[in-house]
Amino acid sequence: MNIQYIVECLALLREKKPLVVNITNYVVMNNTANALLALGASPIMAHSQQEMAEMMSFSGALVINIGTLDSVWTPRMHFAVEQANLNNKVVVLDPVGCGASQLRTQVARQIAEAANKLIIRANASEVIALAGENAQSKGVDALDSSDSAVGAACYVAQKYQCSVVISGETDYIVTQDAQYKLNNGHAMMPFVTGMGCTHTALTGAFAAIGDESGVVATAVLGVAGEIAAEQSAGPGSLQMNLLDTLYQLDEETLTRRLKLTVNA
């Protein structure tokens, strides 16, 4: 894994325009769809069980976000994972609020257990809760630092044979054979709702075209968010500027600004 590979993945995504199936929450559907489009992918928000087998037969990846979880959505998520497995597609799980309630923790663990090809993108508290440890969370927001969740991420990666992306002031990605640390992004980003959900959706887009998609998506969003925040007066303008920056992000800028450490 190196910066050149990340640059090549961005170019390939824009060329291939992969279709990403999203079962995501009501709060962020617009944000994540626009971010995927701005980057160059093709989003579809598919929540009907009747069409899921068809959708997963020709999509590139499945993103599951449990942010507005209920008894109607849960069986649909499980069925979607079954179809992703049948079609050998990657499942990207965002266990929003894992640890905040027994329901969220239980469903997140069930999905993680069921998926054959899995990436988990979460904040530190969610990762710690997924590992079965005591996490500090306030609703869906993390009170733990990303640094404190690396050990839990290693455990989760081994338990579910997956990659784990920890979002925070410093981002960490734990895979089966490596650890990565990225120091991009901006302190304003957590003040925009759904920024982590966007991170998850972009991970799904890159999962549709290559390996190590957690690292690639984290790099792209971190650099884009950093640039967008520098041009923004506050969270409102950051939302708009992020879409523009994802659309305009070029290889030279990504290469110059990326702060990546391998085997951190």
Swiss-Prot record:
GO terms for molecular function: ATP binding; hydroxyethylthiazole kinase activity; magnesium ion binding. It comes from the Bacteria. Pathway: Cofactor biosynthesis; thiamine diphosphate biosynthesis; 4-methyl-5-(2-phosphoethyl)-thiazole from 5-(2-hydroxyethyl)-4-methylthiazole: step 1/1. GO terms for biological process: thiamine biosynthetic process; thiamine diphosphate biosynthetic process. Its cofactor is Mg(2+). Keywords: ATP-binding, Kinase, Magnesium, Metal-binding, Nucleotide-binding, Thiamine biosynthesis, Transferase. Substrate binds at residues 45, 194. The keyword DNA-binding does not apply. ATP binds at residues 121, 167. Disulfide bonds: none annotated. Pfam families: HK (PF02110). Its EC number is 2.7.1.50. InterPro entries: Hyethyz_kinase, Ribokinase-like. It catalyses: 5-(2-hydroxyethyl)-4-methylthiazole + ATP = 4-methyl-5-(2-phosphooxyethyl)-thiazole + ADP + H(+). Catalyzes the phosphorylation of the hydroxyl group of 4-methyl-5-beta-hydroxyethylthiazole (THZ). Belongs to the Thz kinase family. This is Hydroxyethylthiazole kinase. It comes from Aliivibrio fischeri (strain MJ11). The gene is thiM.
